[in-house]
Amino acid sequence: MINNISVAESNNRFGSCTNLEKTLVANAKAEVLNANTDRRYAAFINNSTVDITLILGSPEDGAINKGIILKPRGSYEINANNLYLGKVSAVSAFACKLTHLECI
């Protein structure tokens, strides 16, 4: 679930966001975001009816159910408290779409 922290608790500021959608092919790992040293925030939302596994790293670094599992209607965010700047990949056992955004 996305947990918005108060502005007073974070100095994480960003000026622009890119809103994207990634189509995942069944059982095929895919890169979702490139590594980005300017990243300040990212969110991933599973609007599908099947599980999606997020992989913090290259596609070969994870597998179905070996990463951050997003249940249907689930979400995960990268923020000032867990700022990860590397690649983000994903995989699902079924064809689906992953909605995501990245802010710099």
Segments from the language model and where they lie:
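Short, intrinsically disordered N-terminal pre-domain segments
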Residues: 1-20, 94-104
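Surface-exposed ligand/attachment interfaces on beta-rich extracellular proteins
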Residues: 18-37
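Beta-sandwich interaction modules
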Residues: 34, 71-85
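Short proline/glycine-enriched turn/loop motifs at strand-loop junctions of beta-rich domains
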Residues: 37-39, 46-51, 93-94
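Noncatalytic modules at the cell exterior or secretory-pathway interfaces
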Residues: 40-42, 80-96
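Hydrophobic beta-strand residues in large extracellular and virion-surface proteins
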Residues: 44, 52-54, 70, 88-90, ...
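Short, surface-exposed beta-strand/strand-loop-strand elements in extracellular ectodomains
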Residues: 45-66
